[in-house]
Amino acid sequence: MKKSGVLFLLGIILLVLIGVQGTPVVRKGRCSCISTNQGTIHLQSLKDLKQFAPSPSCEKIEIIATLKNGVQTCLNPDSADVKELIKKWEKQVSQKKKQKNGKKHQKKKVLKVRKSQRSRQKKTT
């Protein structure tokens, strides 16, 4: 009798813990940015720029800039300067991606040319 009672209680506890484990805890007002930087940030000093959309844990848009010296600062998403900085950053990132893809494409062309030159050399000998 005692064993069945203990097993029953363990089963109930297990079911409760499984239900609790998957439940997300929603906390309103837990934003990463408490205040925003009022100064100007230059594109050359940026290492990374991340934008976070409103979520259940934070109701406002957050923009966090990581500078080349490692300092992270929050930017005001409503500022005209910040909006311009975001446009320039996105343009710079897309240009870097294009350059990177272009270099890969050029390497493939060089390899193809070298292979075709080798096959021509084999045919002539």
UniProtKB/Swiss-Prot annotation:
It comes from the Eukaryota. One of its GO terms (molecular function) is CXCR chemokine receptor binding. Disulfide bonds join C31-C58, C33-C74. PROSITE patterns: SMALL_CYTOKINES_CXC (PS00471). Gene3D superfamilies: 2.40.50.40. Pfam families: IL8 (PF00048). One of its GO terms (cellular component) is extracellular space. Residues 94-125 have a biased composition (Basic residues). Residues 93-125 are annotated as: Disordered. Keywords: Cytokine, Disulfide bond, Inflammatory response, Secreted, Signal. Residues 1-22 form the signal peptide. Induction: By IFNG/IFN-gamma. The induction is enhanced by TNF in dermal fibroblasts and vein endothelial cells. GO terms for biological process: adenylate cyclase-activating G protein-coupled receptor signaling pathway; cell-cell signaling; cellular defense response; cellular response to lipopolysaccharide; chemokine-mediated signaling pathway; chemotaxis; defense response; defense response to virus. It is found in: Secreted. Belongs to the intercrine alpha (chemokine CxC) family. Cytokine that affects the growth, movement, or activation state of cells that participate in immune and inflammatory response. Chemotactic for activated T-cells. Binds to CXCR3. This is C-X-C motif chemokine 9. It comes from Homo sapiens (Human). The lineage of its organism: Eukaryota, Metazoa, Chordata, Craniata, Vertebrata. The gene is CXCL9.
